[in-house]
Amino acid sequence: MNMQEVYEYLSTVLPEGHVKQDEMLKNHTHIKVGGKADVFVAPTNYDEIQEVIKYANKYNIPVTFLGNGSNVIIKDGGIRGITVSLIHITGVTVTGTTIVAQCGAAIIDVSRIALDHNLTGLEFACGIPGSVGGALYMNAGAYGGEISFVLTEAVVMTGDGELRTLTKEAFEFGYRKSVFANNHYIILEARFELEEGLYEEIKAKMDDLTFKRESKQPLEYPSCGSVFKRPPNNFAGKLIQESGLQGKRIGGVEVSLKHAGFMVNVDNGTAQDYIDLIHFVQKTVEEKFGVKLEREVRIIGEDKE
């Protein structure tokens, strides 16, 4: 299918300015890397997402979905077909102790809305930079909390564009993983069940977690957060630090001097710089400690020709 034709058709379906050709995806990731998307669309509602999916299915066009790009490395060759950004699907409603949040809402914002309504349970998320959809996809967590602890159900869209409601059990949550890595469902909204609490206590906990994050993590540079999952009975950052890898640099990307579990873009790094550094760290840690570090960050897209 000619991508010009795809662009022209989708421009009639989505609002003006929400369909682009050859969009640089580095503008849509936290680490500021990524090549071009053939066609980039940013739907504003579920009907528009359905229209994109049905059109793509009809002509067998590959579709890739993005949240806010906080935990993903997009390769320098970009993404073929249609890239769908969900950052405009951001509605949040509160009813009693229940919060329903759409996929593109920032999980940080949802935690603050919970605070404003004196609801406890999402304090751990006050520093997680991902979207609600991304948080469910990887069962995001921090400081002892996880999305799976407060999620009750979610609305998803199948690869055929049908809406379904799934209970938490269907997600098959594990440590930094869910069933969504292996199926073609798109997370549209999540329902969180929280508990009533005291504003001052909730805020104090969030302030404490924010202080810990700011003091320990290299927030002054672009990064994708923790690169590796925590290995059993150990910590990735500790193993990397004890391997003498802090400050190790490939191209414009280096292992953070502030937190060894992070890789930061210090000088116009590329996706390939990140990937090469990840492989180097994995190889070094395995040789030194016999531990295979598993990536937490997703890598998608095509290599640069």
Curated annotation (Swiss-Prot):
Functional pathway: Cell wall biogenesis; peptidoglycan biosynthesis
Active site as annotated: R176, S226, E296
PROSITE patterns with a match to the protein in the record: FAD_PCMH
EC number(s) from the headed UniProt entry: 1.3.1.98
Keyword terms, alphabetized: Cell cycle, Cell division, Cell shape, Cell wall biogenesis/degradation, Cytoplasm, FAD, Flavoprotein, NADP, Oxidoreductase, Peptidoglycan synthesis
Organism superkingdom: Bacteria
UniProt keyword Isomerase, yes or no: no
Reaction catalyzed: UDP-N-acetyl-alpha-D-muramate + NADP(+) = UDP-N-acetyl-3-O-(1-carboxyvinyl)-alpha-D-glucosamine + NADPH + H(+)
An individual GO BP term: cell wall organization
Pfam families listed in its UniProt record: FAD_binding_4, MurB_C
SUPFAM superfamilies, A to Z: FAD-binding/transporter-associated domain-like, Uridine diphospho-N-Acetylenolpyruvylglucosamine reductase, MurB, C-terminal domain
Recorded GO CC terms: cytosol
Residues covered by the FAD-binding PCMH-type domain: 33-197
InterPro entries tied to this protein: FAD-bd_PCMH, FAD-bd_PCMH-like_sf, FAD-bd_PCMH_sub1, FAD-bd_PCMH_sub2, MurB, MurB_C, MurB_C_sf, Oxid_FAD_bind_N
A GO term for molecular function: UDP-N-acetylmuramate dehydrogenase activity
Location of the protein in the cell: Cytoplasm
Obligatory cofactor(s): FAD
Similarity section: Belongs to the MurB family.
Function field: Cell wall formation.
HAMAP family: MurB
Protein name from the UniProt record: UDP-N-acetylenolpyruvoylglucosamine reductase 2
Gene source species: Bacillus thuringiensis subsp. konkukian (strain 97-27)
Lineage, opening ranks: Bacteria, Bacillati, Bacillota, Bacilli, Bacillales
